[in-house]
């Protein structure tokens, strides 16, 4: 397979400095960006430019490419003939290192619980950027620490089910009386009820709080692309009384200039 000449794609000599590489990429990416260029093959050229910069703009990959003609450590091509992975469709999410790829996991329940739309500048879309945003998430109540009660003594055994979380109901039918188990409606199956509810969360155990989330926008992002950022969404209680945070899904709108 013919190796791509990334220096030629960016219009550079092999002794080009990092600043020269960045400057050439900035110019060509703006020229061929699909949201700007009217050329018929602009998208393919943009992908080539993006691919070239992803190698030459990274010191480690550039070193491998200069020595072996390939950016990967093992000497095999990391790109192949299919273009730059992750940018084949405006609607696809990308960069699996940020979490599951959205849109390709139709049978799975999404691991994110916050959707955020964000408008970024054109040059941030072309070159990438580090951003911090403020989001509202659900977390344990800061007053009762997730108990939902004024004190530990106010969390008592459910009087309806006796702490079992289930009740037995009996229904008369033409076949006779039928007994069945169902989730206790008083405690929702938890086996406990709250005598005096927390004044801050009103027994809900959770509150909405504002927190900051910092993430990297990959260079070359296009209109409508999404990025899944793990560990920045709502706090989710686990069965062992621990907590984990779900993801947020960022969808980008790029300013045209």
UniProtKB/Swiss-Prot annotation:
Cofactor(s), names only, from the UniProt record: Zn(2+)
This protein's GO CC annotations: cytoplasm
PROSITE patterns given in the database record: DNAJ_1, DNAJ_2, ZF_CR
A molecular-function term among this protein's GO annotations: unfolded protein binding
Coiled coil (residue ranges): none
Keywords: Chaperone, Cytoplasm, DNA replication, Metal-binding, Repeat, Stress response, Zinc, Zinc-finger
InterPro entries: DnaJ_C, DnaJ_domain, DnaJ_domain_CS, HSP40/DnaJ_pept-bd, HSP_DnaJ_Cys-rich_dom, HSP_DnaJ_Cys-rich_dom_sf, J_dom_sf
CXXCXGXG motif repeat residues: 141-148, 158-165, 184-191, 198-205
J domain segment(s): 5-69
Family matches, as CDD domains: DnaJ, DnaJ_zf
Record text on subunit structure and interactions: Homodimer.
Domains as described in the record: The J domain is necessary and sufficient to stimulate DnaK ATPase activity. Zinc center 1 plays an important role in the autonomous, DnaK-independent chaperone activity of DnaJ. Zinc center 2 is essential for interaction with DnaK and for DnaJ activity.
Family: Belongs to the DnaJ family.
Protein name, entry field: Chaperone protein DnaJ
Organism for this UniProt entry: Onion yellows phytoplasma (strain OY-M)
Organismal lineage: Bacteria, Bacillati, Mycoplasmatota, Mollicutes, Acholeplasmatales
